[in-house]
Protein backbone atom coordinates (compact mmCIF):
# COMPACT_ATOMS: atom_id res chain seq x y z
CA UNK A 1 0.00 0.00 0.00
CA UNK A 2 1.39 3.43 -0.91
CA UNK A 3 2.09 5.99 1.76
CA UNK A 4 -0.67 8.22 0.35
CA UNK A 5 -3.29 5.45 0.54
CA UNK A 6 -2.13 4.49 4.03
CA UNK A 7 -2.41 8.09 5.18
CA UNK A 8 -5.93 8.35 3.71
CA UNK A 9 -7.06 5.18 5.48
CA UNK A 10 -5.62 6.39 8.78
CA UNK A 11 -7.31 9.77 8.40
CA UNK A 12 -10.68 8.14 7.64
CA UNK A 13 -10.35 5.83 10.63
CA UNK A 14 -9.36 8.70 12.86
CA UNK A 15 -12.39 10.73 11.75
CA UNK A 16 -14.70 7.78 12.38
CA UNK A 17 -13.28 7.19 15.84
CA UNK A 18 -13.53 10.90 16.60
CA UNK A 19 -17.22 10.99 15.63
CA UNK A 20 -17.93 7.89 17.68
CA UNK A 21 -16.01 9.26 20.62
CA UNK A 22 -17.98 12.49 20.56
CA UNK A 23 -21.44 10.96 20.02
CA UNK A 24 -23.43 11.64 23.16
CA UNK A 25 -26.88 11.36 24.68
CA UNK A 26 -28.83 14.43 25.71
CA UNK A 27 -31.66 13.82 28.15
CA UNK A 28 -35.00 15.62 28.08
CA UNK A 29 -36.20 16.20 31.63
CA UNK A 30 -39.45 18.17 31.26
CA UNK A 31 -42.36 18.95 28.94
CA UNK A 32 -41.60 22.66 28.61
CA UNK A 33 -41.57 24.09 25.09
CA UNK A 34 -38.16 25.67 25.60
CA UNK A 35 -35.46 26.24 28.19
CA UNK A 36 -33.11 23.85 29.99
CA UNK A 37 -34.19 20.23 29.87
CA UNK A 38 -36.67 20.81 27.03
CA UNK A 39 -36.80 18.93 23.73
CA UNK A 40 -36.29 22.18 21.83
CA UNK A 41 -33.11 22.89 23.79
CA UNK A 42 -31.87 19.35 23.21
CA UNK A 43 -32.34 19.76 19.45
CA UNK A 44 -30.34 22.98 19.59
CA UNK A 45 -27.49 21.31 21.51
CA UNK A 46 -27.08 18.04 19.57
CA UNK A 47 -24.33 17.20 17.14
CA UNK A 48 -24.53 14.76 14.24
CA UNK A 49 -24.83 11.22 15.55
CA UNK A 50 -26.17 12.17 18.98
CA UNK A 51 -29.22 10.68 20.68
CA UNK A 52 -31.98 12.60 22.44
CA UNK A 53 -33.44 10.58 25.30
CA UNK A 54 -37.01 11.55 26.21
CA UNK A 55 -37.92 8.16 27.65
CA UNK A 56 -38.27 9.45 31.21
CA UNK A 57 -40.78 12.17 30.36
CA UNK A 58 -44.55 11.75 30.20
CA UNK A 59 -47.40 14.07 29.26
CA UNK A 60 -47.68 16.58 26.41
CA UNK A 61 -45.17 19.05 25.04
CA UNK A 62 -47.30 21.88 23.67
CA UNK A 63 -45.46 24.02 21.15
CA UNK A 64 -45.78 27.76 21.69
CA UNK A 65 -42.62 28.90 19.86
CA UNK A 66 -43.17 27.34 16.45
CA UNK A 67 -42.02 24.09 14.90
CA UNK A 68 -39.11 21.96 16.10
CA UNK A 69 -36.22 22.17 13.62
CA UNK A 70 -34.12 19.04 13.19
CA UNK A 71 -30.91 20.07 11.41
CA UNK A 72 -28.58 17.27 12.53
CA UNK A 73 -28.43 13.51 12.09
CA UNK A 74 -30.06 12.50 15.34
CA UNK A 75 -32.09 9.78 17.06
CA UNK A 76 -35.05 10.95 19.15
CA UNK A 77 -36.41 8.33 21.55
CA UNK A 78 -39.70 8.99 23.33
CA UNK A 79 -41.31 7.16 26.22
CA UNK A 80 -43.99 5.62 23.98
CA UNK A 81 -46.77 6.97 21.80
CA UNK A 82 -49.29 6.45 24.60
CA UNK A 83 -47.02 8.20 27.12
CA UNK A 84 -45.47 11.25 25.46
CA UNK A 85 -47.08 13.58 22.90
CA UNK A 86 -45.93 16.67 21.06
CA UNK A 87 -48.80 19.01 20.22
CA UNK A 88 -48.52 21.63 17.48
CA UNK A 89 -51.19 23.69 19.22
CA UNK A 90 -52.95 24.14 15.83
CA UNK A 91 -50.53 26.98 15.14
CA UNK A 92 -47.45 25.31 13.70
CA UNK A 93 -45.96 22.20 12.19
CA UNK A 94 -44.41 19.86 14.77
CA UNK A 95 -41.11 18.72 13.14
CA UNK A 96 -39.12 19.85 10.11
CA UNK A 97 -35.91 18.32 8.82
CA UNK A 98 -33.50 20.27 6.63
CA UNK A 99 -32.31 19.57 3.10
CA UNK A 100 -29.09 17.59 3.08
CA UNK A 101 -27.59 14.19 3.77
CA UNK A 102 -29.08 13.80 7.23
CA UNK A 103 -30.41 10.69 8.94
CA UNK A 104 -33.16 11.22 11.51
CA UNK A 105 -35.02 8.64 13.60
CA UNK A 106 -38.11 9.36 15.70
CA UNK A 107 -39.63 6.69 17.94
CA UNK A 108 -42.09 6.38 20.79
CA UNK A 109 -43.96 9.65 20.28
CA UNK A 110 -47.42 10.94 19.40
CA UNK A 111 -47.29 13.88 17.00
CA UNK A 112 -50.59 15.71 16.97
CA UNK A 113 -52.45 18.90 16.17
CA UNK A 114 -49.78 20.24 13.83
CA UNK A 115 -50.85 22.61 11.08
CA UNK A 116 -49.17 24.23 8.09
CA UNK A 117 -49.52 24.36 4.30
CA UNK A 118 -47.24 21.36 3.75
CA UNK A 119 -46.78 18.60 6.30
CA UNK A 120 -48.87 19.49 9.33
CA UNK A 121 -47.11 16.90 11.48
CA UNK A 122 -43.72 16.57 9.79
CA UNK A 123 -41.97 17.98 6.74
CA UNK A 124 -39.11 15.77 5.60
CA UNK A 125 -36.80 17.66 3.29
CA UNK A 126 -35.06 16.39 0.18
CA UNK A 127 -32.06 14.04 0.65
CA UNK A 128 -32.88 13.42 4.31
CA UNK A 129 -33.67 9.91 5.53
CA UNK A 130 -36.43 9.98 8.14
CA UNK A 131 -37.49 6.86 10.04
CA UNK A 132 -40.65 6.88 12.17
CA UNK A 133 -40.99 3.90 14.54
CA UNK A 134 -43.66 2.94 17.09
CA UNK A 135 -45.26 6.36 16.83
CA UNK A 136 -48.67 7.92 16.20
CA UNK A 137 -49.55 10.89 13.99
CA UNK A 138 -53.03 12.08 14.86
CA UNK A 139 -55.19 15.08 14.03
CA UNK A 140 -52.66 17.00 11.93
CA UNK A 141 -53.78 19.25 9.05
CA UNK A 142 -52.23 20.71 5.91
CA UNK A 143 -52.89 21.56 2.29
CA UNK A 144 -50.53 18.77 1.20
CA UNK A 145 -49.73 15.92 3.56
CA UNK A 146 -51.68 16.29 6.78
CA UNK A 147 -49.42 13.88 8.65
CA UNK A 148 -46.20 14.03 6.63
CA UNK A 149 -44.98 15.86 3.54
CA UNK A 150 -42.02 13.88 2.20
CA UNK A 151 -39.44 14.95 -0.37
CA UNK A 152 -36.66 12.68 0.89
CA UNK A 153 -36.65 9.08 2.06
CA UNK A 154 -39.41 8.16 4.50
CA UNK A 155 -39.49 4.87 6.42
CA UNK A 156 -42.52 4.15 8.62
CA UNK A 157 -42.48 1.09 10.89
CA UNK A 158 -45.16 -0.13 13.30
CA UNK A 159 -46.89 3.24 13.49
CA UNK A 160 -50.41 4.66 13.33
CA UNK A 161 -51.75 7.55 11.25
CA UNK A 162 -55.28 8.55 12.28
CA UNK A 163 -57.65 11.45 11.66
CA UNK A 164 -55.13 13.52 9.72
CA UNK A 165 -56.46 15.78 6.97
CA UNK A 166 -55.25 17.62 3.88
CA UNK A 167 -56.57 18.66 0.50
CA UNK A 168 -54.28 16.04 -1.00
CA UNK A 169 -52.74 13.24 1.03
CA UNK A 170 -54.54 13.21 4.36
CA UNK A 171 -51.88 10.99 5.91
CA UNK A 172 -48.88 11.46 3.60
CA UNK A 173 -47.97 13.51 0.55
CA UNK A 174 -45.04 11.80 -1.17
CA UNK A 175 -43.56 14.23 -3.69
CA UNK A 176 -41.83 13.44 -6.97
CA UNK A 177 -38.44 13.11 -5.27
CA UNK A 178 -39.91 11.17 -2.35
CA UNK A 179 -39.36 7.49 -1.61
CA UNK A 180 -41.63 6.05 1.07
CA UNK A 181 -41.61 2.59 2.62
CA UNK A 182 -44.40 1.70 5.06
CA UNK A 183 -44.55 -1.55 7.03
CA UNK A 184 -46.62 -3.02 9.85
CA UNK A 185 -48.59 0.20 10.19
CA UNK A 186 -52.22 1.32 10.36
CA UNK A 187 -53.91 4.24 8.59
CA UNK A 188 -57.48 4.97 9.67
CA UNK A 189 -59.90 7.86 9.57
CA UNK A 190 -57.67 10.09 7.44
CA UNK A 191 -59.39 12.39 4.96
CA UNK A 192 -58.64 14.44 1.86
CA UNK A 193 -61.37 16.59 0.30
CA UNK A 194 -59.57 16.35 -3.05
CA UNK A 195 -57.55 13.13 -3.35
CA UNK A 196 -55.73 10.47 -1.37
CA UNK A 197 -57.19 9.94 2.09
CA UNK A 198 -54.15 7.94 3.19
CA UNK A 199 -51.62 9.22 0.68
CA UNK A 200 -51.15 11.23 -2.48
CA UNK A 201 -48.16 9.57 -4.13
CA UNK A 202 -46.13 11.25 -6.86
CA UNK A 203 -42.84 9.45 -6.20
CA UNK A 204 -42.22 5.85 -5.19
CA UNK A 205 -44.17 4.19 -2.38
CA UNK A 206 -44.34 0.68 -0.98
CA UNK A 207 -46.92 -0.39 1.60
CA UNK A 208 -46.33 -3.80 3.21
CA UNK A 209 -48.00 -5.76 6.01
CA UNK A 210 -50.23 -2.79 6.80
CA UNK A 211 -53.91 -1.86 7.09
CA UNK A 212 -55.64 1.08 5.40
CA UNK A 213 -59.21 1.35 6.69
CA UNK A 214 -62.05 3.85 6.87
CA UNK A 215 -60.24 6.66 5.08
CA UNK A 216 -61.98 8.98 2.61
CA UNK A 217 -61.38 11.34 -0.29
CA UNK A 218 -63.16 12.70 -3.34
CA UNK A 219 -61.02 10.27 -5.37
CA UNK A 220 -58.71 7.62 -4.01
CA UNK A 221 -60.18 7.07 -0.57
CA UNK A 222 -57.04 5.13 0.32
CA UNK A 223 -54.26 6.18 -2.07
CA UNK A 224 -54.20 8.44 -5.13
CA UNK A 225 -51.22 7.35 -7.19
CA UNK A 226 -49.50 9.21 -10.02
CA UNK A 227 -46.10 7.64 -9.33
CA UNK A 228 -45.12 4.05 -8.56
CA UNK A 229 -47.11 2.26 -5.87
CA UNK A 230 -46.79 -1.30 -4.55
CA UNK A 231 -49.12 -2.82 -1.96
CA UNK A 232 -47.95 -6.14 -0.47
CA UNK A 233 -49.49 -8.41 2.20
CA UNK A 234 -51.85 -5.63 3.22
CA UNK A 235 -55.54 -4.96 3.80
CA UNK A 236 -57.35 -2.00 2.24
CA UNK A 237 -60.91 -1.98 3.58
CA UNK A 238 -63.87 0.27 4.29
CA UNK A 239 -62.47 3.29 2.45
CA UNK A 240 -64.65 5.65 0.43
CA UNK A 241 -64.39 7.77 -2.70
CA UNK A 242 -67.14 10.32 -2.21
CA UNK A 243 -66.78 12.29 -5.46
CA UNK A 244 -69.85 12.64 -7.67
CA UNK A 245 -68.24 14.19 -10.74
CA UNK A 246 -67.18 12.34 -13.89
CA UNK A 247 -63.83 10.65 -13.42
CA UNK A 248 -64.09 10.47 -9.63
CA UNK A 249 -63.72 7.10 -7.99
CA UNK A 250 -61.36 4.62 -6.45
CA UNK A 251 -62.67 3.74 -3.01
CA UNK A 252 -59.42 1.96 -2.17
CA UNK A 253 -57.06 3.50 -4.71
CA UNK A 254 -57.07 5.69 -7.81
CA UNK A 255 -54.21 4.89 -10.17
CA UNK A 256 -52.92 7.05 -13.01
CA UNK A 257 -49.43 5.55 -13.34
CA UNK A 258 -47.91 2.24 -12.15
CA UNK A 259 -49.47 0.13 -9.41
CA UNK A 260 -48.85 -3.41 -8.18
CA UNK A 261 -51.11 -5.29 -5.74
CA UNK A 262 -49.56 -8.48 -4.36
CA UNK A 263 -50.99 -10.93 -1.80
CA UNK A 264 -53.40 -8.32 -0.44
CA UNK A 265 -57.11 -8.00 0.31
CA UNK A 266 -59.21 -5.11 -1.02
CA UNK A 267 -62.62 -5.34 0.66
CA UNK A 268 -65.69 -3.38 1.65
CA UNK A 269 -64.69 -0.16 -0.12
CA UNK A 270 -67.28 2.19 -1.62
CA UNK A 271 -67.27 4.62 -4.55
CA UNK A 272 -70.06 7.07 -5.24
CA UNK A 273 -69.28 6.59 -8.92
CA UNK A 274 -66.81 4.09 -10.43
CA UNK A 275 -64.18 1.71 -9.18
CA UNK A 276 -64.96 0.97 -5.55
CA UNK A 277 -61.90 -1.23 -5.29
CA UNK A 278 -59.49 0.37 -7.74
CA UNK A 279 -60.01 2.97 -10.45
CA UNK A 280 -57.29 2.41 -13.06
CA UNK A 281 -57.36 5.51 -15.21
CA UNK A 282 -56.14 6.30 -18.73
CA UNK A 283 -52.39 5.75 -18.82
CA UNK A 284 -52.44 3.62 -15.69
CA UNK A 285 -50.89 0.16 -15.51
CA UNK A 286 -52.35 -2.04 -12.80
CA UNK A 287 -51.04 -5.52 -11.96
CA UNK A 288 -52.92 -7.69 -9.43
CA UNK A 289 -51.43 -11.00 -8.27
CA UNK A 290 -52.41 -13.51 -5.57
CA UNK A 291 -54.98 -11.10 -4.11
CA UNK A 292 -58.62 -10.94 -3.01
CA UNK A 293 -61.26 -8.35 -3.97
CA UNK A 294 -64.41 -8.83 -1.92
CA UNK A 295 -67.64 -6.94 -1.27
CA UNK A 296 -66.60 -3.64 -2.83
CA UNK A 297 -69.57 -1.57 -4.01
CA UNK A 298 -69.74 1.10 -6.72
CA UNK A 299 -72.86 3.17 -7.08
CA UNK A 300 -72.38 3.31 -10.85
CA UNK A 301 -69.90 0.87 -12.43
CA UNK A 302 -66.90 -1.31 -11.69
CA UNK A 303 -67.40 -2.58 -8.16
CA UNK A 304 -64.07 -4.38 -8.00
CA UNK A 305 -62.02 -2.62 -10.67
CA UNK A 306 -62.76 0.11 -13.21
CA UNK A 307 -60.17 -0.08 -15.99
CA UNK A 308 -59.50 2.40 -18.76
CA UNK A 309 -55.74 1.76 -18.83
CA UNK A 310 -53.91 -1.57 -18.75
CA UNK A 311 -54.99 -4.29 -16.32
CA UNK A 312 -53.15 -7.55 -15.69
CA UNK A 313 -54.86 -9.98 -13.32
CA UNK A 314 -53.51 -13.36 -12.18
CA UNK A 315 -54.15 -15.97 -9.48
CA UNK A 316 -56.69 -13.81 -7.68
CA UNK A 317 -60.21 -14.10 -6.26
CA UNK A 318 -63.05 -11.64 -6.91
CA UNK A 319 -66.15 -12.33 -4.83
CA UNK A 320 -69.41 -10.53 -4.07
CA UNK A 321 -68.42 -7.18 -5.54
CA UNK A 322 -71.29 -5.10 -6.87
CA UNK A 323 -72.23 -2.11 -9.01
CA UNK A 324 -75.64 -0.55 -9.43
CA UNK A 325 -75.44 -0.41 -13.24
CA UNK A 326 -72.57 -2.31 -14.85
CA UNK A 327 -69.85 -4.75 -13.83
CA UNK A 328 -69.96 -5.65 -10.20
CA UNK A 329 -66.57 -7.28 -10.68
CA UNK A 330 -64.54 -5.65 -13.45
CA UNK A 331 -65.45 -2.94 -15.97
CA UNK A 332 -62.97 -2.85 -18.84
CA UNK A 333 -62.68 -0.13 -21.48
CA UNK A 334 -59.08 -0.78 -22.56
CA UNK A 335 -56.36 -3.46 -22.30
CA UNK A 336 -57.16 -6.43 -20.07
CA UNK A 337 -55.37 -9.72 -19.43
CA UNK A 338 -56.73 -12.31 -16.99
CA UNK A 339 -55.53 -15.75 -15.93
CA UNK A 340 -56.15 -18.31 -13.16
CA UNK A 341 -58.70 -16.07 -11.44
CA UNK A 342 -62.01 -16.77 -9.68
CA UNK A 343 -64.97 -14.46 -10.31
CA UNK A 344 -68.03 -14.93 -8.08
CA UNK A 345 -70.89 -12.58 -8.88
CA UNK A 346 -72.31 -10.27 -6.24
CA UNK A 347 -75.87 -9.04 -5.77
CA UNK A 348 -75.77 -6.61 -8.71
CA UNK A 349 -73.68 -6.28 -11.84
CA UNK A 350 -71.99 -9.01 -13.82
CA UNK A 351 -68.50 -10.33 -13.11
CA UNK A 352 -67.00 -8.74 -16.23
CA UNK A 353 -68.25 -6.12 -18.64
CA UNK A 354 -65.79 -5.44 -21.45
CA UNK A 355 -66.47 -2.86 -24.13
CA UNK A 356 -63.00 -2.29 -25.41
CA UNK A 357 -61.04 -1.42 -28.52
CA UNK A 358 -57.93 -2.53 -26.66
CA UNK A 359 -56.46 -6.00 -26.35
CA UNK A 360 -58.48 -8.40 -24.19
CA UNK A 361 -56.87 -11.75 -23.46
CA UNK A 362 -57.83 -14.76 -21.39
CA UNK A 363 -54.71 -16.66 -20.38
CA UNK A 364 -56.98 -19.51 -19.36
CA UNK A 365 -57.84 -21.42 -16.19
CA UNK A 366 -60.33 -18.80 -14.98
CA UNK A 367 -63.59 -19.68 -13.24
CA UNK A 368 -66.66 -17.44 -13.37
CA UNK A 369 -70.06 -17.91 -11.76
CA UNK A 370 -71.67 -16.23 -14.80
CA UNK A 371 -70.68 -16.02 -18.46
CA UNK A 372 -67.57 -13.97 -17.64
CA UNK A 373 -68.50 -11.25 -20.09
CA UNK A 374 -68.06 -13.83 -22.86
CA UNK A 375 -64.30 -13.18 -22.90
CA UNK A 376 -63.20 -16.28 -20.97
CA UNK A 377 -62.39 -18.47 -23.95
CA UNK A 378 -58.91 -19.64 -23.03
CA UNK A 379 -57.79 -23.18 -22.15
CA UNK A 380 -59.29 -24.49 -18.94
CA UNK A 381 -61.72 -21.58 -18.52
CA UNK A 382 -64.96 -22.45 -16.70
CA UNK A 383 -68.07 -20.27 -16.92
CA UNK A 384 -71.51 -20.39 -15.29
CA UNK A 385 -69.93 -22.41 -12.50
CA UNK A 386 -70.19 -21.88 -8.74
CA UNK A 387 -66.64 -21.71 -7.32
CA UNK A 388 -67.84 -22.87 -3.86
CA UNK A 389 -66.12 -20.26 -1.72
CA UNK A 390 -66.17 -19.85 2.03
CA UNK A 391 -66.79 -16.44 3.63
CA UNK A 392 -64.13 -13.74 3.80
CA UNK A 393 -62.39 -14.58 7.05
CA UNK A 394 -59.12 -15.35 8.80
CA UNK A 395 -57.82 -18.52 7.15
CA UNK A 396 -54.25 -17.90 8.29
CA UNK A 397 -51.72 -15.41 7.04
CA UNK A 398 -51.78 -11.61 7.40
CA UNK A 399 -54.95 -10.98 5.35
CA UNK A 400 -58.48 -12.37 5.14
CA UNK A 401 -59.24 -14.76 2.27
CA UNK A 402 -62.04 -16.86 0.77
CA UNK A 403 -61.17 -20.52 1.25
CA UNK A 404 -62.04 -23.10 -1.39
CA UNK A 405 -64.68 -25.42 0.04
CA UNK A 406 -64.32 -29.16 -0.40
CA UNK A 407 -65.44 -30.08 -3.89
CA UNK A 408 -64.74 -26.65 -5.37
CA UNK A 409 -64.17 -26.87 -9.13
CA UNK A 410 -61.23 -24.48 -8.64
CA UNK A 411 -59.19 -27.15 -6.81
CA UNK A 412 -56.36 -28.55 -8.93
CA UNK A 413 -57.85 -26.78 -11.96
CA UNK A 414 -55.24 -24.07 -12.49
CA UNK A 415 -52.57 -23.93 -15.16
CA UNK A 416 -50.92 -27.38 -15.26
CA UNK A 417 -47.75 -25.75 -16.55
CA UNK A 418 -47.40 -23.42 -13.56
CA UNK A 419 -44.16 -23.59 -11.61
CA UNK A 420 -43.26 -21.28 -8.69
CA UNK A 421 -42.62 -18.48 -7.98
CA UNK A 422 -44.72 -17.48 -6.23
CA UNK A 423 -44.04 -20.31 -3.81
CA UNK A 424 -47.00 -19.51 -1.54
CA UNK A 425 -50.63 -18.54 -1.93
CA UNK A 426 -51.95 -15.18 -0.70
CA UNK A 427 -51.44 -16.18 2.92
CA UNK A 428 -47.67 -16.45 2.62
CA UNK A 429 -45.14 -18.87 4.15
CA UNK A 430 -46.71 -22.08 5.40
CA UNK A 431 -49.29 -22.16 2.60
CA UNK A 432 -47.65 -23.66 -0.46
CA UNK A 433 -48.85 -22.42 -3.83
CA UNK A 434 -48.92 -25.90 -5.37
CA UNK A 435 -50.47 -28.90 -3.57
CA UNK A 436 -51.20 -32.26 -5.20
CA UNK A 437 -48.98 -31.39 -8.19
CA UNK A 438 -51.29 -28.74 -9.67
CA UNK A 439 -52.13 -25.18 -8.68
CA UNK A 440 -55.68 -24.19 -7.68
CA UNK A 441 -57.49 -21.33 -9.39
CA UNK A 442 -57.60 -18.09 -7.41
CA UNK A 443 -55.56 -16.67 -4.54
CA UNK A 444 -56.18 -19.55 -2.10
CA UNK A 445 -54.59 -22.99 -2.29
CA UNK A 446 -56.31 -25.86 -0.49
CA UNK A 447 -53.61 -27.42 1.69
CA UNK A 448 -55.12 -30.88 2.26
CA UNK A 449 -53.75 -33.78 0.28
CA UNK A 450 -55.64 -35.95 -2.15
CA UNK A 451 -57.87 -35.04 -5.03
CA UNK A 452 -61.35 -33.87 -3.99
CA UNK A 453 -64.21 -35.00 -6.17
CA UNK A 454 -65.46 -31.98 -8.12
CA UNK A 455 -69.11 -31.15 -7.55
CA UNK A 456 -69.43 -28.06 -9.69
CA UNK A 457 -72.81 -26.40 -9.56
CA UNK A 458 -74.06 -24.76 -12.73
CA UNK A 459 -75.93 -21.53 -12.32
CA UNK A 460 -78.31 -20.00 -14.84
CA UNK A 461 -76.94 -17.37 -17.15
CA UNK A 462 -77.23 -13.90 -15.73
CA UNK A 463 -80.21 -11.81 -16.62
CA UNK A 464 -80.03 -8.89 -18.99
CA UNK A 465 -77.84 -6.09 -17.81
CA UNK A 466 -79.42 -2.64 -17.53
CA UNK A 467 -78.14 -0.07 -19.95
CA UNK A 468 -76.28 2.70 -18.16
CA UNK A 469 -77.56 6.20 -18.67
CA UNK A 470 -74.12 7.67 -19.04
CA UNK A 471 -70.74 6.69 -20.36
CA UNK A 472 -68.11 6.28 -17.69
CA UNK A 473 -64.98 8.13 -18.73
CA UNK A 474 -61.83 8.60 -16.75
CA UNK A 475 -60.49 12.13 -16.58
CA UNK A 476 -57.28 12.08 -14.58
CA UNK A 477 -56.00 15.49 -13.69
CA UNK A 478 -52.37 14.62 -13.16
CA UNK A 479 -49.73 12.68 -14.99
CA UNK A 480 -46.99 10.56 -13.55
CA UNK A 481 -43.47 11.89 -13.55
CA UNK A 482 -41.97 9.00 -11.64
CA UNK A 483 -39.70 6.63 -13.48
CA UNK A 484 -38.61 4.36 -10.66
CA UNK A 485 -39.95 0.83 -10.56
CA UNK A 486 -40.66 -1.37 -7.60
CA UNK A 487 -40.25 -5.12 -7.51
CA UNK A 488 -42.72 -6.70 -5.12
CA UNK A 489 -40.30 -9.09 -2.89
CA UNK A 490 -64.48 7.87 7.43
CA UNK A 491 -64.85 8.60 8.88
CA UNK A 492 -63.23 11.92 9.49
CA UNK A 493 -65.76 14.65 10.04
CA UNK A 494 -63.55 17.67 9.78
CA UNK A 495 -63.42 19.71 6.58
CA UNK A 496 -60.26 21.47 5.57
CA UNK A 497 -60.47 24.92 4.04
CA UNK A 498 -57.72 26.07 1.84
CA UNK A 499 -55.55 28.87 0.58
CA UNK A 500 -51.88 28.56 -0.01
CA UNK A 501 -50.97 27.37 -3.45
CA UNK A 502 -48.44 24.90 -2.17
CA UNK A 503 -46.77 23.25 -5.13
CA UNK A 504 -44.19 20.62 -4.26
CA UNK A 505 -41.60 19.42 -6.73
CA UNK A 506 -44.18 17.31 -8.50
CA UNK A 507 -46.80 18.01 -11.07
CA UNK A 508 -49.67 17.77 -8.65
CA UNK A 509 -50.93 21.01 -7.16
CA UNK A 510 -53.38 21.66 -4.44
CA UNK A 511 -55.25 24.55 -3.00
CA UNK A 512 -55.56 24.50 0.72
CA UNK A 513 -56.20 26.93 3.40
CA UNK A 514 -53.99 27.81 6.32
CA UNK A 515 -57.17 28.72 8.17
CA UNK A 516 -57.95 25.11 8.81
CA UNK A 517 -59.78 25.21 12.09
CA UNK A 518 -61.93 22.13 12.51
CA UNK A 519 -60.62 19.35 14.64
CA UNK A 520 -61.14 15.94 13.12
CA UNK A 521 -62.77 13.33 15.24
CA UNK A 522 -60.29 10.65 16.16
CA UNK A 523 -61.54 7.22 15.29
CA UNK A 524 -58.96 4.64 16.34
CA UNK A 525 -59.52 1.18 15.00
CA UNK A 526 -58.17 -1.36 17.43
CA UNK A 527 -59.04 -4.21 15.06
CA UNK A 528 -57.29 -3.39 11.79
CA UNK A 529 -58.12 -6.61 10.04
CA UNK A 530 -61.11 -6.39 7.71
CA UNK A 531 -64.51 -7.37 8.85
CA UNK A 532 -65.77 -10.56 7.30
CA UNK A 533 -68.31 -9.94 4.57
CA UNK A 534 -69.31 -6.31 5.20
CA UNK A 535 -72.44 -5.23 3.35
CA UNK A 536 -71.82 -1.75 1.99
CA UNK A 537 -74.27 -2.27 -0.84
CA UNK A 538 -77.20 -1.67 1.46
CA UNK A 539 -75.93 1.75 2.46
CA UNK A 540 -76.94 3.65 -0.64
CA UNK A 541 -79.30 3.52 -3.60
CA UNK A 542 -78.57 6.81 -5.39
CA UNK A 543 -79.94 7.93 -8.71
CA UNK A 544 -77.28 7.57 -11.40
CA UNK A 545 -75.59 10.59 -12.84
CA UNK A 546 -74.96 10.71 -16.55
Feature roles, as predicted:
Residues 1-24:
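Sec-dependent, cleavable N-terminal signal peptides
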Residues 19-118, 124-126, 130, 329, ...:
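N-terminal, post-signal-peptide segments of secreted/periplasmic proteins
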Residues 25, 31, 75, 110, ...:
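Ser/Thr-centric signal marking residues that sit
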Residues 28, 42, 76, 95, ...:
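Extracellular/surface recognition and adhesion modules
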Residues 129-137, 150-168, 173-195, 199-218, ...:
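Predominantly extracellular beta-rich ligand-binding scaffolds that present long acidic/polar faces
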Residues 144, 299-300, 533:
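Leucine-biased recognition of intrinsically disordered, low-complexity hydrophobic segments
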Residues 176, 247, 283, 449-450, ...:
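Residue-identity detector for glycine
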Residues 451-545:
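Ser/Thr-rich, Proline-interspersed low-complexity disordered segments
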Amino acid sequence: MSKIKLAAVCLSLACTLTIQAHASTITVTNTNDNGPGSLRQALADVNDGDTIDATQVSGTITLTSGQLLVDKSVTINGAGAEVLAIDGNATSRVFQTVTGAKTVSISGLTISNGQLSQGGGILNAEATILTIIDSTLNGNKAGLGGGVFNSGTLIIINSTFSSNMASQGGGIYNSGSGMSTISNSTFSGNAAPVAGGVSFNVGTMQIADSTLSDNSADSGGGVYNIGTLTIINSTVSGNMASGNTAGAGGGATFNVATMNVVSSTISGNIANREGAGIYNSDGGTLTITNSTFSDNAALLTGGGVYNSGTLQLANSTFSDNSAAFLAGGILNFANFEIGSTILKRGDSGENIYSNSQGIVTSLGYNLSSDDGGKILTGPGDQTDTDPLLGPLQDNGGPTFTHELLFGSPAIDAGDPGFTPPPFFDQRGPGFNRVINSRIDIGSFEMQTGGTPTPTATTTPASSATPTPTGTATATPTATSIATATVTPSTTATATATATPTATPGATATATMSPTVTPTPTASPRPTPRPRALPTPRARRTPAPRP
